């Protein structure tokens, strides 16, 4: 098995563990067991549980091609409308037809809120940094245009 494939296997196992047990209730040992590897091998790929968490966070934010498209738009009222429609549409889609991976992400978020909230805070911060500048600039342009 290649290093990249093993890394993805570990991340997949970690997502399941974090979604089921929360950040505090998940250990690197339990992630290693879920990935059917030794804890030492897990540490070759990720130096800590927090590093695993951060990698999942980065994947969640960067995996959405629609978000990448929106962030590439020129700030404007139209971009602001697209951003809001995209955010609302995302959550409506989750409600109507969540796929397995999306359901797992939602469990991870809910579990985080029920636990210490660390993952949720990190995700909100990451999303805020990704979307915030475009959102704020688009809102400013809309206000300046009187829209």
Features from the language model and the residues they span:
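Short, leucine-enriched amphipathic alpha-helices that occur as contiguous helical runs
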Residues: 3, 7-15
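Helix-turn-helix
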Residues: 9, 17-59
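Short alpha-helix boundary/capping elements
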Residues: 50, 61, 81, 113-118
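Hydrophobic alpha-helical connector segments
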Residues: 55, 68-104
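Conserved phosphoryl-transfer catalytic core
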Residues: 60-68
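Hydrophobic faces of stable alpha-helices that mediate helix-helix packing
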Residues: 61, 99-106, 128, 132, ...
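Amphipathic alpha-helical packing segments from all-alpha helical-bundle domains
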Residues: 65, 81-86, 117-144
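Amphipathic alpha-helical segments used for helix-helix packing
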Residues: 97-125
């Amino acid at each position: 098995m290649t290093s990249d494939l093993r890394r993805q296997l570990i991340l997949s196992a970690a997502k399941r563990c974090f979604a089921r047990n929360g950040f505090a209730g998940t250990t690197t040992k339990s992630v290693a067991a879920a990935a059917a590897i030794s804890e030492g091998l897990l540490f070759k790929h990720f130096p800590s549980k927090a590093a695993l968490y951060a990698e999942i966070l980065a994947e969640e934010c960067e995996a959405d091609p629609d978000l990448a498209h929106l962030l590439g738009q020129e700030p404007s009222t139209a971009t602001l409308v697209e951003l809001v429609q995209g955010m609302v549409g995302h959550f409506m889609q989750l409600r109507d037809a969540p796929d397995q991976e999306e359901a797992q992400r939602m469990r991870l978020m809910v579990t985080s809120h029920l636990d210490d909230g660390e993952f949720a805070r990190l995700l909100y911060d990451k999303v805020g940094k990704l979307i915030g500048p475009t959102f704020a600039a688009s809102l400013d342009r809309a206000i300046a245009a009187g829209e």
